[in-house]
Each structure stands twice: as structure tokens, then as C-alpha cells.
Amino acid sequence: MLLRDAAYELGGGANEAVNFTCVTSDAALVPSDEVLLYGPDMKEIKGDVPFARIVILGVKDIDVEKKDAAYAAIRNIEFVKYHVFPDGYMMRVSPESSREQIRVSKKAVKKGISFYKVGCDFIKQYKKNPNITNVRVIFVTKDVDFKALHATAKKIEDVTKTMNTILEGMPEDLDCASCSFKPVCDEVEGLKELHFGKAAKKEHHA
């Protein structure tokens, strides 16, 4: 999509932009599919605005003892955002900085494109994955604490990178004290157990 065909850009120019995905096996946190919007919808936006897209996924417990299957499940979840192509909604994603900028066409705005419709497209794609039970998609189009959102995105990226590295195969006799992932493992419950093959399913009490 050429710039002259765009009505505006979400996260364009000097505006903030961030996206990240959280995963939980606690069904109470994502009891149903949902699309939430904080800020103006697409038909109300008149120029470039800040933008965030946050996804919270409810997933089945992944059997980490089957490391190849667990690794594939995590990677498949990450790739969903590259398979959503709403008409007139062009995504530019920078994995290194967790930025996601969107160019929205004038034609799409006239046709009634909305965040609800785009969110439903994301949900449809995510739920093709049999490990995913429910999806909450959150869009933000106004000024909020983007510094905190970027910090959260960085933390999630570090955890995902650590999990991927563990599942790809780390020596079980590795000295944790000398490992670059130690700060992440110290903070996130279960990563050390995952590394040493002792992951146990947590019991959920009502």
C-alpha cells in the first residue's frame, strides 16, 4: 500500500508503537474470546496515532517432556501475526524492537474496517492452533504508559527466548550461575525445572 493511499498510520511517524503476546494455561484469565479497544476506533481516527496490540492466549497445558512438540507449539503461536491480512490493513512488524506499525487505507475506512473485525481475524487464525483455547486481543490507540508496555514486551521476549533455548536443547549439567539466562530463570517460576526435565503440572485450586 502506497502512502498516498493511506488514511493514516497506527504507530506511524514519531508515535509510540508496541505489540506482544502473553500465554497462560489458567483458564480463568481468558475465559472467552474477546476484542477490547482503548481509544478511538478506525472510523474516528483522523491522523497518525500511538498504537499497541496486546494478545493474551489461553492455552492447554503443553507437555514439556515432549520437547519437540512444545517447541513447535511455541513457534506456531508466534507466527500467527504473519498470517493475518485484513483488506486495507498493512502491518509492518519489527521483532527486534517489538514495534508494529499499521497503514490503514482510505478505501478500508470507507468500507467500515474496525478493530473488532481485525481482532476477529486474529482470533480466527490463533484458534487454528489446537493448543489455543481462548484469545483476548487488546488494541490501544491513545496515549498510555508506553514505557511500561515496552518493558513488558522486553520481559516476554526474554522469557520466550529462554524457553526456546531450553527446548532446543541445553546441557543438563550447565552451571546456572554462569548462564546468561539466569536472571530470567530466577524470576520466572518453572524455567529451571523445564531445563532439568522436572517440570510438573501445577495444581489449580478453586
PLM-predicted stretches and their roles:
Residues 2-138:
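Long, charged N-terminal interaction/targeting segments
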Residues 143-145, 202-206:
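Short Fe-S-cluster ligation motifs
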Residues 15, 83, 150, 195, ...:
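Histidine (H) residue identity feature
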Residues 154-197:
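Cysteine-cluster motifs in flexible loop/terminal segments that predominantly coordinate metals
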Residues 52-59, 95-97, 181, 192-202:
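Generic hydrophobic segment detector
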Residues 5-8, 69-72, 121-124, 147-154, ...:
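Polar/charged alpha-helical tracts
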Residues 1, 98-106, 129, 133-146, ...:
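Extended non-catalytic scaffold regions that mediate assembly and binding
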